[in-house]
């Protein structure tokens, strides 16, 4: 499995986009300039890391000697810690990409979210697991959702009644979270569609 850091993914995306726009890869200097590196040498180090992971091939002796090897469409971004008020899929929140086919989940997964805590343990969602999430606001009562309440993101079972939303844990030690839609900001970020046990990828 090829796992890219957020910075490595930025370099990879820049190479891919440059090829799509110009028909050729960028030079080290262009990568450094675009991503704010201090020198082309810093870009070279990231390219070497990408080559070691097998997602690009470096062709020696050519300033634009970069060839893409990774089929990007099988990668699902892993969202790390989310800062208050910022979009869940903002680039700076993406820790890495997991080479998992999104279509193995129904509906397909758009991103992975690292589970924190044991509030959903009774249905097999454990601390440290990677929750596969389909990005949608179209959810029904009884489904496991990723919800945002006043800038905090949580994973719970949804129960909506009029202006009140109850987010239910699957662990009797955790009380429901009650949201009054007339007073609090609330949105649905996505629907849980599966779990990847993190130990499966070690």
UniProtKB/Swiss-Prot annotation:
UniProt entry tagged with the keyword DNA-binding: yes
Pfam families registered for this protein in UniProt: LexA_DNA_bind, Peptidase_S24
Which UniProt keywords are present, listed alphabetically?
A: Autocatalytic cleavage, DNA damage, DNA repair, DNA replication, DNA-binding, Hydrolase, Repressor, SOS response, Transcription, Transcription regulation
* Active site feature: 119 (for autocatalytic cleavage activity), 156 (for autocatalytic cleavage activity)
Known catalysed reaction(s)? Hydrolysis of Ala-|-Gly bond in repressor LexA
Question: Which sections of the sequence are annotated for DNA binding?
Answer: 28-48
Is ATP-binding one of the keywords?
Answer: no
| The EC number(s) this enzyme carries | 3.4.21.88
Similarity-based family: Belongs to the peptidase S24 family.
Q: What's the protein here called?
A: LexA repressor
Which gene is annotated as encoding this protein in its UniProt record?
A: lexA
